[in-house]
C-alpha cells in the first residue's frame, strides 16, 4: 500500500527539469583586467564565473567554478535554511561563503555570471522566490537559480535509477526510476518528523539523559559528556537554551553521540540504531512508490551525519541492505554545491 507521506513528481515536472540541468559546459572566454580597486582582485574572466551553494540547517558550502567547469575555491559558512534562520540571515551566510571563495580565487564579485543555490527549506514556491529575489539583490547582474537541497542532491547522484538519502540536520529521501519518475519523502522539519536526523538524534539523546538523571539521581556517562562538551552548567540551562534555539542545540549533540557510540557507549549506540532504522524506512518508502525494489539501483548517502561515525555508518548500511538487498550503496558523483553551480550554468 502506498504511503501518504511520499509525494510523486513525474518526469515532465519541475523537479526533473531542475535536477538534470547539470551537464552543459560553457565555452571559455579570454581574460580581461578588472579594475576593482583591490590588490586581491586583479584578473577575472569576463562575466563567466559561477557560484554554487549547498545550504542546510547547520552550514553552507560554496564552490566557485570557472568557464571550463573547474572548481577554483570551496568555502563554508553558517546555516542558510531560510525556513529556519530567515531569508535575511540565509542570504548573509550565502554572501559570506561567496566572498570567502571569491577572495581565495582573487575574483571580483561583479565577474559572477550566475549562481545556483540548493537550499533546505525552499520546498514552497513562495520561499524559493523570496530567496531568489534576495540573492538577485546581493549579486546584481548574475542569473540566480534556487533549487531545493533534494533537487541538487539528486542531480549530484548522476543518471539512472537511484535513491538519495539526505541525513543532516533534517532527513529526507528522493528517488528516480528508469522511467524518470521521481518520488520523495521526509523533509518535513524536526517538529513534524525528520526521524534519524541530527536534530532527532540530539533531542533523543538529551531526553534520554534527562530521564536517566531523574531515575538514578546522577548523570549517565552520555549525559555528562553532553553537558560538558556543550558547556552547560546544568540541565536546566540546557533546557532554557533548547526552548529558545532548538535548531542550535539539538544538532550540536550529534557529534557527541557519534563519538560515544564509537567508544562503545551502549546508550549512544541504541540511539543510533534507532536512527538508522528511521532512515532506512525513508529509503524503503521511496523504493516502494517508485517501483525500485526490483531494479539494480544505487543508494547514495549524503548529509552532515554521513561519514562522522564508524558505528553509525555500518549500522545504516546494514539497515539499507536489509531493506533493499539488491541495492548498491555509494556516494555522490559530485558535491551538491557543484551540482548547483553546473545547473545554474545551463
Spans of model-derived segments:
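Phosphate-binding/catalytic loop of phosphoryl-transfer enzymes
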Residues: 122-220
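Glycine-rich beta-strand-to-loop/alpha-helix junction loops that act as flexible
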Residues: 116-123, 167-169, 297-308
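Short, intrinsically disordered or compositionally biased N-terminal tails of bacterial proteins
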Residues: 16, 20-25, 38-46
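Short, basic and Ser/Thr-rich N-terminal targeting/leader segments
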Residues: 56-58, 113, 167-169
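Glycine- and acidic-rich phosphate- and metal-coordinating loops
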Residues: 112-118, 147
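Low-acidity, Ser/Thr- and Arg-rich intrinsically disordered low-complexity segments
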Residues: 3-8, 12, 19-24, 29-33
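Short, positively charged and aromatic/hydrophobic N-terminal segments
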Residues: 33-35, 42-43, 147
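ATP-binding/phosphotransfer module of carbohydrate and carboxylate kinases, centering on a glycine-rich
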Residues: 41-110, 134, 139, 156-162, ...
Amino acid at each position: 500500500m502506498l504511503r501518504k507521506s511520499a509525494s510523486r513528481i513525474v518526469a515532465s515536472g519541475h523537479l526533473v527539469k531542475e535536477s538534470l540541468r547539470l551537464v552543459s559546459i560553457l565555452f571559455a572566454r579570454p581574460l580581461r583586467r578588472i579594475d576593482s580597486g583591490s590588490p586581491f582582485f586583479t584578473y577575472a574572466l569576463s562575466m563567466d564565473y559561477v557560484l554554487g551553494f549547498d545550504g542546510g540547517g547547520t552550514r553552507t558550502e560554496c564552490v566557485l567554478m570557472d568557464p571550463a567547469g573547474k572548481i577554483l575555491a570551496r568555502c563554508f559558512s553558517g546555516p542558510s535554511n531560510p525556513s529556519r534562520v530567515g531569508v535575511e540571515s540565509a542570504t548573509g551566510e550565502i554572501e559570506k561563503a561567496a566572498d570567502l571563495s571569491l577572495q581565495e580565487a582573487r575574483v571580483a564579485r561583479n565577474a559572477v555570471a550566475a549562481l545556483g543555490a540548493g537550499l533546505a527549506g525552499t520546498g514552497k514556491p513562495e520561499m524559493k522566490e523570496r530567496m531568489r529575489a534576495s540573492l538577485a539583490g546581493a549579486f546584481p547582474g548574475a542569473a540566480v537559480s534556487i533549487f531545493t537541497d533534494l533537487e541538487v542532491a539528486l542531480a549530484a547522484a548522476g543518471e539512472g535509477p537511484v535513491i538519495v538519502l539526505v541525513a543532516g540536520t533534517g532527513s529526507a529521501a528522493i528517488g528516480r526510476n528508469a522511467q524518470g519518475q521521481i518520488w520523495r519523502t521526509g523533509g518535513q522539519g524536526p517538529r513534524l518528523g525528520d526521524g534519524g536526523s541530527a536534530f532527532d538524534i540530539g533531542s533523543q539523546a538529551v531526553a534520554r539523559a534527562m530521564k536517566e538523571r531523574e531515575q538514578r539521581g546522577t548523570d549517565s556517562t552520555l549525559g555528562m559528556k553532553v553537558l560538558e562538551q556543550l558547556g552547560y552548567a546544568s540541565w536546566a540551562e540546557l533546557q532554557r537554551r533548547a526552548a529558545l534555539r532548538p535548531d542550535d542545540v539539538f544538532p550540536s549533540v550529534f557529534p557527541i553521540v557519534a563519538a560515544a557510540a564509537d567508544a562503545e557507549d551502549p546508550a549512544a549506540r541504541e540511539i543510533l540504531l534507532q536512527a538508522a532504522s528511521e532512515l532506512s524506512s525513508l529509503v524503503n518508502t521511496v523504493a516502494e512508490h517508485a517501483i525500485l525494489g526490483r531494479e539494480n539501483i544505487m543508494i547514495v548517502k549524503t548529509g552532515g551525519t554521513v561519514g562522522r561515525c564508524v558505528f553509525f555508518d555500518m549500522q545504516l548500511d546494514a539497515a539499507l541492505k536489509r531493506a533493499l538487498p539488491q541495492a548498491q550503496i555509494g556516494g555522490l558523483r559530485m558535491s551538491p554545491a557543484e551540482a548547483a553551480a553546473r545547473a545554474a550554468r545551463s
